[in-house]
Regions:
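Glycine-rich phosphate-binding loop and adjoining beta1-alpha1-beta2 segment
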Residues: 4-5, 61-99
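N-terminal charged helix/coil linker that caps or initiates catalytic domains
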Residues: 1-36, 69-70, 254-263
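A short, aliphatic-rich alpha-helical micro-motif
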Residues: 30, 119-121, 317-318
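A structured beta-alpha segment of the ubiquitous adenosine-cofactor-binding alpha/beta core
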Residues: 84-136
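Glycine-rich phosphate/adenylate-binding loop
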Residues: 1-6, 35, 115-125, 129-264
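Residue-level detector of alpha-helix initiation sites
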Residues: 42-45, 50, 56, 66-67, ...
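Rhodanese-like catalytic fold shared by cysteine-dependent sulfurtransferases
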Residues: 2, 15, 93, 226-283, ...
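Glycine-rich adenosine-cofactor-binding loop
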Residues: 26-52, 58-63
Length: 369
């Protein structure tokens, strides 16, 4: 075997251990660490391989989603051959390709209030790469109860932000954001898009924060948030302190209800809608996505009215007996439902989970993206 391929920490991590203040001791702390990563999507795809390459001993991956073709532009840990496969498994295989000595635990589940504390048990640090506020508040609260640090990040369009929540050392996510924004008010990647390189930048900073906390080098982003604007190429830092008005965290709650994203009487599930249509129900389906999305997949018989054009189309919908609005995942349909409600459509409903839920729960032939 060539000398350069002989597997020892000294040659694999030589350039890392040569850093001032790092050395073998810091490398050993990385090797002994157990890090849980929530999400193997846009942020997780940068975080997971970075942790593996740095030598984190055990990586726990939590993700219940599957790889879609539209994920690949920003989720570089997956490839074309992985489309349709569980993201957590695909990510685990990528780790093995970087360093087969890294232990990987795969949990093909969604983080919930029911499983969070069990998943956090025995973990040294959590990295939250999720894409919704309910999971961010849950990950913060569970980390506070477990007494471990949380590195969180978020991206949207051309910008992103990173912070560290650590109840024992400083303020938490709730101190920065005491209450969640109204549903649909913050554009998700689904609704507003995201530049893939923003995911890479933010994911790299998240990984760096994790390495700093584990090894004890540098000053973690405790009480500080770093923001990145890709359009200007600039970084900014915001400082914040503990919020004395925040109630202490003593239990996990229903985070969908807290964030206003739980299904309501104004929602219909995909199986329920399928049953209504099969029974001959008179339902007017209104698709509030964009044309390019409808070109990928749409529900039969639906009418395309992009959200930005909904006000102009209201009069044409007044004769409909029953209106059901849908989008990709549900954010835009919630905003559309508010518009219709304000214009007298008291019985209008939205499809819970959007066309993505229809594909998963009713008709797998409808393409996911």
């Amino acid at each position: 075997m060539q000398e350069s391929l002989v597997e020892t920490p000294a040659n694999r991590y030589a350039r890392q251990m040569a850093l001032p203040g790092f050395g073998p001791a810091a490398q050993q702390r990385l090797a002994a660490a157990r890090v849980l990563v929530i999400g193997a999507g846009g942020l997780g795809s940068s975080v997971i391989p970075a942790l593996a390459a740095a030598g984190v001993g055990t990586i726990v991956i939590v993700d219940d989603d599957t790889v879609e073709l539209s994920n690949l532009h920003r989720q570089h840990i997956h490839g074309v051959a992985d489309v349709g496969r569980p993201k957590a498994r695909s990510a685990a295989e990528s780790v093995a390709g970087i360093d087969p000595a890294i232990a990987v635990e795969v949990h093909e589940v969604r983080l919930t209030a029911g499983n969070a504390l069990e998943l956090y048990a025995g973990v040294d640090l959590v990295i939250d790469g999720s894409d919704n506020f309910a999971t961010r508040y849950l990950s913060n609260d569970a980390a506070a109860l477990a007494g471990i640090p949380l590195v969180w990040g978020a991206v949207s369009q051309y910008a992103g932000q990173v912070g560290v929540a650590w109840a024992a050392r400083g303020p938490q996510y709730r101190d920065l954001f005491p209450t969640p924004p109204p549903p649909g008010s913050v554009l998700s990647c689904e609704a507003g898009g995201v530049l893939p390189t923003v995911c890479s930048v933010i994911g790299s900073i998240m990984s760096t924060e994790a390495i700093k906390i584990i090894t004890g080098i540098g000053a973690p982003l405790i009480g500080r948030v770093t923001t990145f604007d890709a359009l200007t190429g600039g970084f900014r830092e915001l400082s914040y302190e503990r919020n004395p008005n925040c109630a202490p965290i003593d239990a996990l709650i229903d985070y969908e209800v807290f964030c206003g994203t739980a299904p309501t009487v104004d929602s219909v599930t995909a199986p329920q809608l399928a049953s209504e249509l099969a029974a001959g129900g008179t339902v007017t389906l209104v698709d509030v996505r964009e044309q390019w999305e409808a070109d990928i997949a749409s529900l039969p018989g639906s009418r395309l009215v992009p959200l930005g054009s909904l006000d102009d189309a209201i009069d044409g919908l007044r004769s409909a007996e029953s209106v059901v609005i849908y989008c990709h995942l549900g954010a835009r349909s919630a905003r559309a439902l508010d518009i219709l409600r304000n214009n007298g459509f008291t019985s209008a409903r939205q499809l819970d989970g959007g066309i993505d839920a229809w594909s998963r729960l009713v008709d797998p032939d409808v393409r996911r993206y």
